[in-house]
């Protein structure tokens, strides 16, 4: 697990120069964050079911210019059951458009790899469309948000096949007055499916601490 934490911290530190460079261009608003997630993975193949849980640490970077938004996330961790475990690597690269100040439309790939000792890696790749809606609870301080997504094409490498899926995330974001830090508490659920009855459902409770340079 310490390796996953180190990777997440390294990713966040590497993002700092990029954030500073983009922020220096007045047309860009940028931020980055570090997330810890308690994940529960439920796997079903036919009548066989498996439940695993563990911690996943990730980093994210968001850049906004006018109505355009780009979001990158990458994380690593490990989920375990009584007798076995899997390393988890996940990430996404999304391009968004702010249709309204409170509504953002997204498109892009989301990938997750499960590494099981003695077996080939299992890789899910889904291209999805997403919608994020926000509501202000305390203007400029506290917001609620809901994000829904649906995959329109995808694949699983083992066993090879076409994949589909969808998910949702909801939570709260807090921004401190005259401070460059923000926080997010959220719940996320998503599911990947392939023909033959195979399903992978991932639930996560996430806590994010972020930084955005003040103008």
Residues covered by each model-derived region:
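Cleavable N-terminal export/targeting peptides
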Residues: 1-29, 214-215
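Short glycine/proline- and aromatic-enriched beta-strand/turn motifs that initiate or cap beta-hairpins
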Residues: 22-80, 206, 210-214
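Membrane-spanning beta-strands of outer-membrane beta-barrel proteins
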Residues: 52-56, 86-90, 124-126, 163-167, ...
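Membrane-embedded beta-strand positions in outer-membrane beta-barrel channels/transporters
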Residues: 56-60, 90-94, 128-132, 167-171, ...
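Outer-membrane beta-barrel transmembrane domain signature
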Residues: 67, 100-103, 112-199, 210-215
């Amino acid at each position: 697990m310490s390796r996953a934490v180190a990777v997440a911290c390294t990713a966040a530190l590497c993002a700092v120069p990029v954030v500073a460079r983009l922020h220096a261009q007045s047309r860009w608003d940028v931020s980055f964050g570090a997330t810890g997630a308690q994940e529960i993975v439920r796997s079903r193949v036919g009548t066989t079911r498996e439940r695993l849980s563990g911690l996943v640490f990730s980093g994210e970077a968001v850049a906004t210019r006018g109505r355009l938004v780009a979001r990158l996330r990458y994380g690593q961790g490990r989920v375990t059951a009584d007798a076995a475990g899997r390393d988890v690597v996940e990430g996404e690269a999304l391009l968004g458009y702010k249709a309204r100040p409170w509504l953002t439309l997204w498109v892009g790939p989301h990938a997750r790899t499960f590494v099981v000792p003695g077996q080939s890696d299992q890789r899910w790749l889904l291209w999805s469309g997403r919608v994020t809606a926000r509501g202000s609870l305390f203007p400029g301080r506290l917001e609620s948000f809901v994000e829904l997504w649906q995959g329109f094409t995808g694949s699983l490498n083992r066993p090879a096949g076409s994949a589909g899926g969808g998910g949702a995330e909801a939570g709260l974001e807090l921004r401190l007055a005259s401070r460059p830090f923000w926080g997010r508490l959220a719940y996320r659920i998503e599911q990947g499916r392939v023909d033959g009855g195979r399903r992978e459902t991932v639930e996560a409770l996430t806590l994010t601490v972020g930084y955005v340079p003040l103008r």
